[in-house]
């Protein structure tokens, strides 16, 4: 597999920046509408690490708030995890410059990660879990109803392939998820947005990007390989990532091998192969069969 092409995101003319912004605003607005990510009266914690994704997320939500037909509040939060040389002041200055209510947090998870993760292994999974725990506690303390994260389309499709190829499961990052402790709801308003658009926009806006490798962690080699595979496929067929994202929203359960699902479908007294709820072209289940899917999802959440 050849290495993906390196993309250079040059500063664009203002009319191009405006087009990028409109595309990102439209993607976020569609996701918010489709999955009811934000409601009237919500207080949203926007987790900002200092990377291109979270800066763009903050910008997009601030712009949407200006024109939204509902009333919601934003509070930007940055977490310094004790990584050597982490420049939290850069992020705080950005918060002050854009005039967003904000809070700076500190929790030395870095030393915990170093103790738990063997030398040479990627620290990202453990670091991410510890970071989520700190943010969850802070959100509850601050009275936030939602936590907004900056994951985008490419994150979702990469995770889909990682789960299928390395874990044997069809799943990805959901646009909306209640945390295991039941106290917090995580939302991903950029789930429809392309990483390429986000990177180009962040460059054009000259966001003060904080390096993501200050901890010295090894890269996640599996994710890196999947990203390279997607880049190679996209060179041949540019719609690949969009098609994979669409696949997450066009599931044909009767054409899968989930035995629990098939037992629930059978309990409706209808056979999707014989009763016309499915076709070989990928039509979606309707009526009672769709109700079975809802029951299955609820049963799995309770398990």
From Swiss-Prot:
The keyword Secreted appears for this protein: no
Pfam hit, one: ATP_bind_3
Localization of this protein: Cytoplasm
Enzyme Commission number: 2.8.1.-
Bound cofactor: record note: Binds 1 [4Fe-4S] cluster per subunit. The cluster is chelated by three Cys residues, the fourth Fe has a free coordination site that may bind a sulfur atom transferred from the persulfide of IscS.
Chief localization: cytoplasm
GO CC annotations on file: cytoplasm
Amino acids binding [4Fe-4S] cluster: 124, 127, 215
Keywords for this protein: 4Fe-4S, ATP-binding, Cytoplasm, Iron, Iron-sulfur, Magnesium, Metal-binding, Nucleotide-binding, RNA-binding, Transferase, tRNA processing, tRNA-binding
Locus of motif PP-loop motif: 49-54
Swiss-Prot/TrEMBL cofactor(s): Mg(2+); [4Fe-4S] cluster
Protein family (similarity comment): Belongs to the TtcA family.
Task of the protein: Catalyzes the ATP-dependent 2-thiolation of cytidine in position 32 of tRNA, to form 2-thiocytidine (s(2)C32). The sulfur atoms are provided by the cysteine/cysteine desulfurase (IscS) system.
Miscellaneous note of the record: The thiolation reaction likely consists of two steps: a first activation step by ATP to form an adenylated intermediate of the target base of tRNA, and a second nucleophilic substitution step of the sulfur (S) atom supplied by the hydrosulfide attached to the Fe-S cluster.
Assembly, per entry: Homodimer.
Name of protein: tRNA-cytidine(32) 2-sulfurtransferase
Organism expressing this protein natively: Anaeromyxobacter sp. (strain Fw109-5)
Gene (UniProt): ttcA
């Amino acid at each position: 597999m050849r290495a993906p092409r390196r993309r250079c995101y040059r500063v664009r003319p203002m009319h191009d920046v405006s087009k990028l912004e409109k595309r990102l605003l439209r993607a976020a607005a569609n996701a918010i509408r489709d999955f009811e990510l934000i409601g009237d009266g919500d207080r949203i914690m926007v987790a900002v690490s200092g990377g291109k994704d979270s800066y763009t997320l903050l910008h997009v939500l601030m712009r949407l708030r200006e024109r939204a037909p509902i009333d919601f509040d934003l509070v930007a939060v940055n977490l310094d995890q004790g990584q050597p040389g982490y420049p939290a002041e850069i992020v705080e200055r950005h918060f002050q410059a854009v005039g967003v209510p904000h809070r700076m947090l500190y929790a030395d998870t870095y030393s915990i990660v170093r103790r738990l993760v063997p030398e040479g292994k990627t620290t990202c999974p453990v670091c991410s879990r510890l970071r989520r725990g700190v943010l969850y506690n802070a959100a509850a303390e601050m009275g936030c109803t939602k936590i907004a994260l900056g994951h985008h389309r490419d994150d979702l499709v990469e995770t889909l392939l990682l789960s299928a190829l390395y874990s044997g499961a069809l799943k990805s990052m959901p646009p909306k998820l209640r945390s295991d402790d039941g106290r917090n709801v995580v939302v991903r308003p950029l789930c429809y947005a392309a990483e390429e658009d986000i990177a180009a926009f962040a460059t054009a806006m000259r966001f003060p990007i904080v390096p993501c490798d200050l901890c010295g962690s090894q890269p996640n080699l599996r994710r890196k390989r999947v990203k390279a595979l997607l880049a190679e496929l996209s060179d041949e067929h540019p719609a690949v990532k969009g098609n994979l994202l669409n696949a997450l929203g066009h599931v044909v359960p009767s054409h899968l091998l989930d035995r629990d699902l098939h037992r629930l479908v059978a309990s409706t007294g209808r056979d999707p192969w014989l009763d016309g709820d499915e076709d070989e072209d990928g039509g979606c289940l309707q009526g009672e069969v769709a109700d079975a899917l809802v029951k299955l999802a609820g049963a799995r959440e309770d398990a």
